[in-house]
Amino acid sequence: MSKILEGLNPAQKEAVINYNTPSLIIAGAGSGKTRVLTSRIAYMLEQGVSAENILALTFTKKAANEMRERIDAMVGTAARRINMGTFHSIFARILRENAEAIGFKREFTIYETTDSKNLIKTIIKERNLDEDKYKPGMVQSRISTAKNSLITPGSYAANAALTGDDRSRQVPEFANIYLEYCRRCKQNNAMDFDDLLLQTNILLRDRPDILSQYQQQFQYILVDEYHQVLYRSIHSCKSTDIQQ
């Protein structure tokens, strides 16, 4: 028996060795979910799966570093070749590799929250809108919500229910602000943190050739703290249609 399986209970062992089938591990805090995930990756490497074919996504950078250290302790330097990181870091890498396909340059800037808010403030001021109604923080939050729901500016403007709700909230210009905000970001070769996931979805949706490339590369996807993952992140994973 592999040493990697030592100390695991029967259910944990089953989750580790059956790596060719999709698995969802549900258990309480402190029950060893992360240990199962790292053991599964280590076992896959031991069984001959190429590190380059594994994509491990985590909720935080700290979790990614800890997982890599654990796997390294079990199987050695092979762990360093695994594609592992947060959703934002992995998707930023994918976008930089394919930025031109969605109209950006590879060296695009990633806006911090303050950068985004300042741009929104500028747009509101240029349009002579009432800042008591169009509070920059509120507008920024609504733009983030739209992107989290995979709603682009064009789709938002074409959605009668959304624009009708804006009118009832007395912010009928929101769709135009959203559109202009995204236009300015692209003009400045910049994305905000929400764009890293939204634009990855757009890239994989609109470029089947690029999607196919990552389907072939990432043959195994493993997600830590799946319950905390945003819808658009899950959608990006599922769009690859490979082992999860």
What are the roles of these predicted feature ranges?
Residues 4-20:
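N-terminal pre-P-loop "Q-motif" helix
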Residues 21-39:
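Walker A/P-loop
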Residues 16-17, 140, 237:
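Hydrophobic residues on short alpha-helical segments
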Residues 2-7, 33, 37, 43, ...:
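Conserved RecA-like helicase ATPase core segment
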Residues 15, 27-29, 56, 63-64:
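Small-residue (primarily alanine) positions within well-ordered alpha-helices
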Residues 2, 20-21, 42-220, 228, ...:
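A basic/glycine-biased coupling hinge at the interface between accessory DNA-binding modules
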Residues 11-14, 40, 199, 235-236:
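Well-ordered alpha-helical segments embedded in enzymatic catalytic cores
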